[in-house]
């Protein structure tokens, strides 16, 4: 059976022109030519608002919603026009949109100052460092902090509490640690754990599939943070050798692109933990280098290098940012969590 019959509720239109006073009140049912059957397919695939559709490519939407590519292209164009996605905006318009960005506190004043107030939503932040440098501790702490009210540096609204999703590739999520950190913040540990959604990824394909599962879940709950720990582990193990490098990087690029879309659509923080390698030919300086190449470095708006220091302390160095200078902050990991 072809898809043509299942899409007959989509009406052909030469041009999709929509004049609206407030796009926030529009739904996918308002898209020109989208009937009940197509709308149901879109919702089942996790596309329940114009932004989620507008940031997709025709091929991806066709694959995920089981629609024809031509139909998907028309739906995407309609969503982009209705939600004003993809056109040129003035610098003032961009500045106004930036006001939607939230800052998630790390719980350490020095780190928050380093990051201009905290970890940004609508961005991918990369943490990289050797084992024991604090990457997993950071991810647990930020997950707990996301449950704090907005006025306390969290991402949780009283009427719409925040939820955090962990894509765990190395079996490092520890609910016991979440309980410790939540209690230290004065939060109910059981409630915090209920709002942490954890899935173990067993290979790179499963890891990418879990992003689609987060997308579907976001239609019913307030997803404010996605953690991938670690982002490169499976790709590094499965795509071995120079001959498979191009294929690995293509898949990794798509994975990061989908995470960025989730971040934009849900105004959420995306935190990816990355592994490192040592450059044997380094003659001077720190030989430690993040794995993943330019794909990860370009996808990450903020790159933070974690390393061990003396007396059990650790150093977070902001290596790259679109608007902040390089700098360092010193922190410690104690029973209650991260502290200055």
Segment roles from a protein language model:
Residues 1-30:
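Long, low-complexity intrinsically disordered regulatory regions enriched in P/S/T/G and acidic residues
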Residues 249-253, 257-340:
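Phosphate-binding/switch region of NTP-binding enzymes
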Residues 159-244:
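Conserved inter-motif catalytic segment of the P-loop NTP-binding fold
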Residues 58, 169-171, 230-232, 275-276, ...:
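Short, ordered loop/turn segments at secondary-structure junctions
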Residues 38-41, 78-191:
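The Walker A/P-loop phosphate-binding site
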Residues 28-31, 42-64:
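A short amphipathic alpha-helix within small helical-bundle interaction modules
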Residues 105-108, 112, 121, 136-140, ...:
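Amphipathic alpha-helical transducer elements in NTP-driven molecular machines
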């Amino acid at each position: 059976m072809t898809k043509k019959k299942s899409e007959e509720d989509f009406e052909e239109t030469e041009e999709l022109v929509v004049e609206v006073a407030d796009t926030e009140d529009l739904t996918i049912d308002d898209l020109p030519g989208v009937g009940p059957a197509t709308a149901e397919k879109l919702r089942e695939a996790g596309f329940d608002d114009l932004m989620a559709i507008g940031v997709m490519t025709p091929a991806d939407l066709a694959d995920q919603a089981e629609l024809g590519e031509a139909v998907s292209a028309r739906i995407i164009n309609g969503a982009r026009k209705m939600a004003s996605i993809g056109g040129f905006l003035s610098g003032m318009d961009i500045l106004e949109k930036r006001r939607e960005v939230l800052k998630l506190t790390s719980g350490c004043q020095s780190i928050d100052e380093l990051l201009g107030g905290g970890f940004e939503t609508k961005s991918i932040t990369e943490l990289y460092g050797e084992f024991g440098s604090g990457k997993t501790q950071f991810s647990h702490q930020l997950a707990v902090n996301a449950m704090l009210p907005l006025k306390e540096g969290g991402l949780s609204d009283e009427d719409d509490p925040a939820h955090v999703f962990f894509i765990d590739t190395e079996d490092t999520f520890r609910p016991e640690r979440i309980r410790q950190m939540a209690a230290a913040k004065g939060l109910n540990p059981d409630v915090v754990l209920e709002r942490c959604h954890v899935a173990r990824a067993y290979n790179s394909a499963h890891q990418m599939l879990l992003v689609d599962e987060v997308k579907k879940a976001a239609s019913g709950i307030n997803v404010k943070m996605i953690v991938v720990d670690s982002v490169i582990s499976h790709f590094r193990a499965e795509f071995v050798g120079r001959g498979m490098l191009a294929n690995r990087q293509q898949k990794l690029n798509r994975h990061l692109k989908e995470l960025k879309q989730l971040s934009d659509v849900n105004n959420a923080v995306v935190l990816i933990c990355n592994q490192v390698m040592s450059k044997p030919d380094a003659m001077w300086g720190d030989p430690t280098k993040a794995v993943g190449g330019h794909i990860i470095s370009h996808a990450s708006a903020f790159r933070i290098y974690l390393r061990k220091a003396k007396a059990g302390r650790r150093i977070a160095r902001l290596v790259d940012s679109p608007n902040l200078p390089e700098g360092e902050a010193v922190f410690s990991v104690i029973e209650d969590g991260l502290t200055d």
